[in-house]
Amino acid sequence: MAAVAATAAAKGNGGGGGRAGAGDASGTRKKKGPGPLATAYLVIYNVVMTAGWLVIAVGLVRAYLAKGSYHSLYYSIEKPLKFFQTGALLEILHCAIGIVPSSVVLTSFQVMSRVFLIWAVTHSVKEVQSEDSVLLFVIAWTITEIIRYSFYTFSLLNHLPYLIKWARYTLFIVLYPMGVSGELLTIYAALPFVRQAGLYSISLPNKYNFSFDYYAFLILIMISYIPIFPQLYFHMIHQRRKILSHTEEHKKFE
């Protein structure tokens, strides 16, 4: 679930506000873009989101320098992290109204998986907030999103520096496993507290004759990483080779 969003996914068409990773084809074929008004809005949106994740990055660095330790740095960036990650819900709307040519279903899945991890796990189970695993996925997300939103901004302006394109299609090699590891370890750390408190679980009997075990649900989410992670990771590796090699060939003909 959250694994798909760790590096902003491997499928989709990007387009400045939708979510796509090493699999978007913006480097290999041109598509009709949004109108002038929509483009202006998307540029502003992506600039704001880039700035937001830069604020998170600076907050992490400042907190580390002040404390001299990487433990419990989450508390120093908790509010901006929640705000800007939740703000990504707008990307679902971008796809729904057609200003970004990405799948509404895929984008919803990717965005909601991150929002779920932030609010339904990290926020709800406060005992895990001091875990190093939280910092692991926060750092991975932060670097990924700074690059991703910068990529979309420059793409919309038709002036994409090769360094940003290279970073987008290369750094996921480290950031994706790093983010996934942090997510899994955080969910795992939350399990005993969820079970003890019966968090978000619904027991029978009740008037709706319905039960839900949040503890088991989290375990299923962790299991879902097993088929999803390798498939997306190697797909992204393949797309990286295709897109960056196409860029190199294009440079030779210039």
From Swiss-Prot:
The chain crosses the membrane at residues 42-60, 80-97, 108-125, 131-146, 170-187, 218-235. Belongs to the very long-chain fatty acids dehydratase HACD family. Residues 61-79, 126-130, 188-217 are lumenal. It is a multi-pass membrane protein. Residues 12-21 have a biased composition (Gly residues). This is Very-long-chain (3R)-3-hydroxyacyl-CoA dehydratase 2. It comes from Homo sapiens (Human). It comes from the Eukaryota. InterPro entries: Tyr_Pase-like_PTPLA. It is found in: Endoplasmic reticulum membrane. The modification N-acetylalanine is found at A2. May interact with enzymes of the ELO family (including ELOVL1); with those enzymes that mediate condensation, the first of the four steps of the reaction cycle responsible for fatty acids elongation, may be part of a larger fatty acids elongase complex. Interacts with BCAP31. Interacts (via the third lumenal loop) with TECR. It is an enzyme of class 4 (lyase). Highly expressed in testis, spleen, prostate, colon and heart, followed by moderate expression in thymus, ovary, small intestine, peripheral blood leukocytes, liver, skeletal muscle and pancreas. Weakly detected in kidney, placenta, brain and lung. Turns over rapidly through degradation by the proteasome system. It catalyses: a very-long-chain (3R)-3-hydroxyacyl-CoA = a very-long-chain (2E)-enoyl-CoA + H2O; (3R)-hydroxyhexadecanoyl-CoA = (2E)-hexadecenoyl-CoA + H2O; (3R)-hydroxyoctadecanoyl-CoA = (2E)-octadecenoyl-CoA + H2O; (3R)-hydroxyeicosanoyl-CoA = (2E)-eicosenoyl-CoA + H2O. Catalyzes the third of the very long-chain fatty acids (VLCFA) elongation four-step cycle (condensation, reduction, dehydration, and reduction). This endoplasmic reticulum-elongation process is characterized by the addition of two carbons to the lipid chain through each cycle. This enzyme catalyzes the dehydration of the 3-hydroxyacyl-CoA intermediate into trans-2,3-enoyl-CoA, within each cycle of elongation. Therefore, it participates in the production of various VLCFAs involved in multiple biological processes as precursors of membrane lipids and lipid mediators. One of its GO terms (molecular function) is enzyme binding. Keywords: Acetylation, Endoplasmic reticulum, Fatty acid biosynthesis, Fatty acid metabolism, Glycoprotein, Lipid biosynthesis, Lipid metabolism, Lyase, Membrane, Transmembrane, Transmembrane helix. GO terms for cellular component: endoplasmic reticulum; endoplasmic reticulum membrane. The active site is at Y176, E183. Glycans are attached at N209. Residues 2-41, 98-107, 147-169, 236-254 are cytoplasmic. Residues 198-214 are annotated as: May be involved in interaction with TECR.
